[in-house]
UniProtKB/Swiss-Prot annotation:
One Pfam family linked to the record: Cpn60_TCP1
Keywords assigned by UniProt, alphabetized: ATP-binding, Chaperone, Cytoplasm, Nucleotide-binding
Self-association state and partner proteins as the record states: Component of the T-complex protein 1 (TCP1) complex.
Example of a GO cellular component annotation carried by this entry: chaperonin-containing T-complex
PANTHER family linked to this entry: CHAPERONIN
Name of the protein this chain belongs to: T-complex protein 1 subunit gamma
Entry function: Molecular chaperone; assists the folding of proteins upon ATP hydrolysis.
Keyword Chaperone tagged: yes
Naturally occurring in which organism (per UniProt): Encephalitozoon cuniculi (strain GB-M1) (Microsporidian parasite)
Compartment annotation: Cytoplasm
Membrane-spanning parts: none
Major place of residence: cytoplasm
Record carries keyword Nucleotide-binding: yes
Amino acid sequence: MQKPIPRKMYILVPDKPAQIQNESAIAAKTISSVIRTCLGPRAMQKMVLTKINSIELTNDGNAILRELDVAHPSARSLIELAKTQDDEVGDGTTSVVLLAAEILNEMTYILDRDVHPIRICKALGRALEICIKAIDGAAISLDSNEETKIKIINGSVASKICNILKVPIGNLALEAVKKVYVKEENKCDLKNNMKVEKVLGGNLMESEVVDGVLINKDIIHPQMRRVIENPRIVIIESPLEYKKGESQTNYEFSKENDFTRALEIEEEQVREMCERIIGVRPDIVVCEKGISDLALSILFENNITGLRRLKKTDISRLSKVCGARSVSRPEDLEERHVGVSCGLFEYIKYGEEYYCKFSRCAHPKACSVVIRGPTKDILDELERNFMDAVKVAKSIFISPKLCPGGGAAEMAMAHELMQSAGDNEVEAEVFSRMASALTIIPSILLENSGVFNPLEAITLLEQKHKEGSFYGVNGTTGEIVDTRDLVLEPYAVKSQCIKSAVEAVSQLLRIDGIIESKR
């Protein structure tokens, strides 16, 4: 008898649209209050007990929010907002959530006057256009000076643990991006061309960028060469073993010598593969799958170093740095498949682990980054800091424009909105409310820096912005200063931040019902 198909029940929550939108604003405000103290150079650290019972010490907005177990769908969408910001530009994860929550909170006052959400969303779209123009007006071009770039990257991680421990994350991030960045295509594929290796123990200052590839693999034979200059490298995808049948195979032997002959045929097949490889005179054979003991001994006799069972991602990076082209089987090997761009192969020890290091490459299109630290928790946090820094460095290369930091860009947007006259009463109020919401960033920077009266400082900042759009908050001292000499941020970070915040608010304002699905 056929089992009955389980039915789903849909429960429509019987709330009024205005009540649901107000609840969304409350949920957003609650989420933002968690990370309110994580903004600026005086940011506080959070100790997070993760879902797998490990401890993280961090002030990264995305790292904190992703560990929260929240029930309200609007709160979940804000957590996704932080993740998107982190994936796109690597910085501004805390700012985007704070902005979105504050803008949504301000819009609820307009909703209370029975203004339709669609009219508010339309006005928000117009306000976003004005904000982008304000950022464009405040933006300055980035010169090719490396010191300026490092200063900007360091500014994005000024509140992180790497700055407290004096680890040169900015230098590492810039060096890594320079190796991976393709100027002709204006692209920087960090995911496929860069790998971070965390090494427990050693000096923090020993962290480095390898101009090649670092692979955590042992050499198969203990007597194979461990240091090779200008190696010829061959990459093979198929195993160097006897090819077994696709399905289960049975052999029947009628004579005593047949079994011996079967073993000889297996050996001959492996020898043929090895002879084909030896024919192109390689120094190193990298195999994606296994290498049999017989093949291993043949390679060793011919002074060839063998590596087996490597990940596809490692093989892809190795191919890019040494110029080798992977082949599916040894029979296809030709001279053009041999990689000769690598200058040095070493089998070295980092901490307690052994690595195969391919360095001194002529035209490296990939790199490995070694991060060292005293404990696992610090290593994990340093890796997060580095990934944030490297994404900021990437945005600098792809879009070489800068904005004044310290809340100056937000105040410039607020000033522009206050100067703009809306086409109707709703637009005018949306502009005014959004301008008020944008001041949340400099306000929190002032609070976190320990200023006694933030409201007085904000009033002074508003007056200064009549003189120029580059005045902001010194997050360390709480003073109102010209931020062009203090802190600059990538244009991509600021534009992405305001776009994401406004779009998220528009999405939440359009929600007028919540449907729960239960089995």
